[in-house]
Amino acid sequence: MKIMSVNSGSSSLKFQLLEMPQKNLITSGLIERIGSNNATFTLKNQNHKTSKTLEIKNHQQAVSLLLTSLIENKIIARLEDIDGVGHRIVQGGELFQDATALNDVEIAKIESLCDLAPLHNPANLVSIKAFRQVLPSLFQVGVFDTTFHQTIPVKNFLYATPYAWYQKYKVRKYGFHGISYQYITEQMQQLLNKKDAKLIICHAGNGVSLCAVDSGKSIDTSMGFTPLEGVPMGTRSGNIDPAVIKFIAEKENKGIAEITDDLNKKSGLLGVSTISNDARDILAEIKKGNPQARLAFDIQIKRIVDYIASYYVLLKGIDALVFTAGIGENSSFFRSEIIKRLSVLGFRLDEQKNEVQGKTSVITSSDSLQQAFVVPTNEELSIACDVLRIYKKVKK
């Protein structure tokens, strides 16, 4: 079966086409700046990569271009060769406990959740509808970033705000990066040969979050009602005193929406360092002795360590700490700065093993009382696996 995994933004569309259940990558690509006359379309096929700039007015045109290119490049013979498409959808609220086949009813449910994720769900829906318009008979599945966290107990997900906020508006912790956490959890269960493994997973890219996992289930996570909660990230502040919003509104004569935008897009590593939201740039500046870059980095690391310590207590000990995603997989310095702060819990780093980049490896020493791993995530493959599972369930 050929299954496509799609991750759609407001002006972008990232995709992979995989052969399932063999899990072989056939091709991948990225369409950026949708809605402009200088959009870019990049297609990678085995060792061959093509890129072109052209006008792409909307997502429907982007999807048409993508599917036509697959035929033109002889990746597929006809559109019907694609058996299913899986869409990453950021917010599933409490309505979705699993990935789901997409029909009018399910799409309407996703639309009803747009006020919970106004930056993400509308873009996801545009992509779903574009595929429907171009290829109406295509089997489509929604895979949600929040689903994995639906196992979090109420005492861990509910805020101590007026209970009516939850009853009326479903204000609660939802958590994100769930597709990644699902994949890493399954990888670690196999690696440790232990279904009831207790894990703390640190997903560290431009967005950063942590998750406490017990026996394959999320029991707590650092992101909350939105991805803004938790640790400082590339441009997000992470946790702050909510009273700061009113204070800044009065001092700067700003509205709530503008301040929220500042917290989402102008804070975190970028806000404190005043240099960049990219951790690679921050690490390069630290090597040059830049104190502001060091401060931004130290604040982030401190908060990550706080969550790890908290989840260690919550889980009553762990089988493994796992680093994944861009920085988690590729920065030995990032990992070492965290591990050395966890020596009180019995973590001992193996400096040589920690030099690993982008492949599965244990990074703690043989005399370490705790194990830490690097495990590359693969959200696209996880989505494809969900599509295959739902396809078999629906089509049997």
Curated annotation (Swiss-Prot):
GO terms for molecular function: acetate kinase activity; ATP binding; magnesium ion binding. Mg(2+) binds at residues 7, 379. The active site is at residue 145. Keywords: ATP-binding, Cytoplasm, Kinase, Magnesium, Metal-binding, Nucleotide-binding, Transferase. One of its GO terms (cellular component) is cytoplasm. The keyword Ribonucleoprotein does not apply. GO terms for biological process: acetate metabolic process; acetyl-CoA biosynthetic process. The record marks 177, 236 as: Transition state stabilizer. Its cofactor is Mg(2+); Mn(2+). It catalyses: acetate + ATP = acetyl phosphate + ADP. It is found in: Cytoplasm. InterPro entries: Ac/propionate_kinase, Aliphatic_acid_kin_short-chain, Aliphatic_acid_kinase_CS, ATPase_NBD. Its EC number is 2.7.2.1. The keyword Zinc does not apply. Substrate binds at residue 88. Pathway: Metabolic intermediate biosynthesis; acetyl-CoA biosynthesis; acetyl-CoA from acetate: step 1/2. Pfam families: Acetate_kinase. Homodimer. Belongs to the acetokinase family. Catalyzes the formation of acetyl phosphate from acetate and ATP. Can also catalyze the reverse reaction. This is Acetate kinase. It comes from Phytoplasma australiense. The gene is ackA.
